[in-house]
Amino acid sequence: MRLTPNYDYEVSSIDKKKRGYIVQIIGPVLDVAFSPGMMPSIYNALVVQGRHKQEPNVTCEVQQLLGNNRVRAVAMSDTDGLMRGMEVIDTGTPISVPVGGSTLGRIFNVLGEPVDQLGPVETNQLSPIHRSAPPFLKLDTRLSIFETGIKVVDLLAPYRRGGKVGLFGGAGVGKTVLIMELINNIAKAYGGVSVFGGVGERTREGNDLYMEMKESGVINQQKLAESKVALVYGQMNEPPGARMRVGLTALTMAEYFRDVNRQDVLLFIDNIFRFVQAGSEVSALLGRMPSAVGYQPTLSTEMGSLQERITSTKEGSITSIQAVYVPADDLTDPAPATTFAHLDATTVLSRSLAAKGIYPAVDPLDSTSMMLQPQIVGEQHYKTAQRVKQTLQRYKELQDIIAILGLDELSDDDRLTVARARKIERFLSQPFFVAEIFTGSPGKYVSLAETIRGCTLILSGEFDDLPEQTFYLVGTIDEVNAKAILEEEKNFTK
């Protein structure tokens, strides 16, 4: 833990720090006693000094004032080896992390310490992870679309530049792969700076993402300053305190690029549910009474303190894309339900589509966006999206009849609707760049104009004579024709 505070705070020498000692340890929670009149503030960072030089210091964050000159703090790392009576130093500031261009290409933990074995970070700029949201007068309310190159997203639930997007899905439906593809596409198309916050997810996925970024050139190990992303990890094997605060560490780094460098920044958080889950663990350890489904009573407040800082100002923007695990595929669970209120667009991943092998498994009817309005996206985009949704909705309504009576019992119009809906469903699948090594198919970036053209042609009946499998895992509509010709040639040679 760095004891030099950020530019927002006055520097005080170590001799003037308030000192206390541990009186109780309950797992990752410590009770610390201080002298009268020397109590630390809520959210201050405390450092437990190791008794020997080789012992690492443990950083904690003050969560409660207990009275009798005692505070309760949550540790950001393992508390193994700590004992009652050990000395604790109040740093006088919240946890402060390095910010600026020197963070690009590096991997950090919740304390802002590099964990990539590439040496210390060359910067004197530190910033506290607890800050207020920007005032209303500084906010930027302009509306513009953020093209991702993913057909189903750009057409039916477009993302807002400087907005917040949620990727909702249960276990194993493709949230992390979709986030990795978005990082890849956006870095290539826009060349902007990104910050990735790995909150309580698998260490293997964090390693895969790092390797993928090195291969694609998003991280340049020869010239780190030319890298486009900073990575902040608090994985699922870490204490709840680290998982609860790692999202704020990533956000603090993104805020610096927005406020000081005046850049447009992308903030990826995987997974926002783990942030809530860690808060629930900490809340129980602090002795608070749980609320609905066992979540912390402060769920809305904690979510708001993170989400309200993710916004666009007149200096720059933060566009946030957050994966949201949905427990038992229940969207009414308090964790995803609380997240919904803060989002501009929701991309819902469907297990039934994943079971059909349609990837990305984005549910075109459940996914929504406040940007899908004719005055924002234009009449052609809006009308095409509505016609696609109407066709898919009618197909969904007819599925029970098809399951019981079969396709032959439908009217000619309904049979045509079902055929076109199945082609659209498959056309909205897409090979991903980050999944090339698994699928063997090269990834495709499809412009919004091409997506609209393709769906318009399918709906108008231009491809009614082609089999639906030719629409599966292609990029533009022109590739469908090429695929159909290849299949005809194969059948002819047989």
UniProtKB/Swiss-Prot annotation:
Its EC number is 7.1.2.2. Transmembrane segments: none annotated. One of its GO terms (biological process) is proton motive force-driven mitochondrial ATP synthesis. GO terms for molecular function: ATP binding; ATP hydrolysis activity; proton-transporting ATP synthase activity, rotational mechanism. It is a peripheral membrane protein. ATP binds at G169, G170, A171, G172, V173, G174, K175, T176. It is found in: Plastid membrane. Keywords: ATP synthesis, ATP-binding, CF(1), Hydrogen ion transport, Ion transport, Membrane, Nucleotide-binding, Plastid, Translocase, Transport. InterPro entries: AAA+_ATPase, ATP-synt_VA_C, ATP_synth_F1_bsu, ATPase_a/bsu_AS, ATPase_alpha/beta_chains, ATPase_F1/V1/A1_a/bsu_N, ATPase_F1/V1/A1_a/bsu_N_sf, ATPase_F1/V1/A1_a/bsu_nucl-bd. It is an enzyme of class 7 (translocase). GO terms for cellular component: chloroplast thylakoid membrane; mitochondrion; proton-transporting ATP synthase complex. It catalyses: ATP + H2O + 4 H(+)(in) = ADP + phosphate + 5 H(+)(out). NCBIfam families: atpD. PANTHER family: ATP SYNTHASE, ATP SYNTHASE SUBUNIT BETA, MITOCHONDRIAL. F-type ATPases have 2 components, CF(1) - the catalytic core - and CF(0) - the membrane proton channel. CF(1) has five subunits: alpha(3), beta(3), gamma(1), delta(1), epsilon(1). CF(0) has four main subunits: a(1), b(1), b'(1) and c(9-12). Belongs to the ATPase alpha/beta chains family. Produces ATP from ADP in the presence of a proton gradient across the membrane. The catalytic sites are hosted primarily by the beta subunits. This is ATP synthase subunit beta, plastid. It comes from Cuscuta sandwichiana. The lineage of its organism: Eukaryota, Viridiplantae, Streptophyta, Embryophyta, Tracheophyta.
